[in-house]
A protein has these predicted regions:
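Short coil-to-helix segment of the ABC ATPase nucleotide-binding domain corresponding to the Q-loop/switch region
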Residues: 101-109
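The feature captures the beta-strand-to-loop junction immediately N-terminal to the Walker
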Residues: 40-42
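Conserved ABC transporter NBD signature motif
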Residues: 63-71
Length: 255
């Protein structure tokens, strides 16, 4: 497999001299094409800062981040915008769908901006909608959808451009247990069947158990790493809980 993401000794500081907070402390790791990686850690551990640096929402203080061999820490504003649009897909906790557009139009928007022809857009939207089980809601507006439906539409929007990587920030945070399970099964489907590379930040061990590998962040450093291997999801969940306990608490309020 080829390396999609290479994080090389990155550090991130906030504040000014005399009052500096180190949010990320010399983190390095790689993500291979087709991996589903979860990131967990206590509140304030640096996990969201890490995702923000990878997504170019924030900038690193030092170190390098390569996506498909390109050092994104060196990109200028115009190139950054193109990189975000074409190389990354985003799934947010609050969906970020446009209320005035239907599900179909929300999913297709990025392709429209990229000037993909209408026939190709129609083909790709319907293929992904079928894969995620949302064909019946393509004509609905966000206010007509449940939270789970909105998040699956957001997932379709994230994958529609065939990005190098999908970044998900607490994707189940606003969902009930049934909708959460449906979304996680959708992400699992994107990973297994469409070979999407996914990096997901979550505080929840159940959510994390759908990933194939977990990075645990503590005090801005990688504290531990788990690889699912041949474990069932339940077995992997139990291993995750063991690490959560080592981090100093239970699944409900520490991560």
């Amino acid at each position: 497999m080829s390396t999609v993401l290479k994080v090389d000794d990155i550090q991130k500081y906030y504040g000014k001299k005399g009052n500096i907070t180190k949010a990320i402390d010399s983190i390095s790791f790689e993500v291979e094409n087709g991996e589903f990686v979860g990131v967990m850690g206590p509140s304030g551990s640096g996990k969201t800062t890490l995702l923000n640096c990878i997504s170019t929402i924030d900038t690193v203080s030092s170190g390098f981040i390569h996506v498909d061999g390109k050092d994104i820490t060196k990109l200028k504003a115009k190139a950054l915008a193109k990189f975000r649009r074409e190389e990354l897909g985003f799934i947010f906790q609050d969906f970020n769908l446009l209320d005035t557009l239907t599900a179909y139009e929300n999913i297709a928007l990025a392709l429209t901006v990229m000037k993909v022809n209408h026939k190709e857009i129609h083909k790709r939207v319907n293929e992904i909608a079928n894969s995620l089980g949302i064909q019946e809601i393509l004509s609905k507006y966000p206010y007509e959808m449940s939270g789970g439906e909105k998040q699956r539409v957001a997932s379709a929007r994230a994958i529609i451009t065939n990005p190098s990587m999908i970044l998900a920030d607490e994707p189940t945070g606003s969902l009930d247990s049934k909708s959460s399970r449906m979304l996680l099964e959708s992400l699992e489907n994107l990973n297994n069947n469409l070979k999407a590379t996914i990096m997901m930040v979550t505080h929840d061990a159940f959510t994390a158990s759908y990933a194939k590998r977990i990075l645990f962040i503590k005090d801005g450093k990688i504290f531990n790493e788990l690889i699912r291997g041949n474990d069932s999801r339940k077995e992997f969940f139990n291993r995750i809980i063991e690490v959560v306990t080592l981090l100093g608490g239970d699944n409900n309020n520490v991560l």
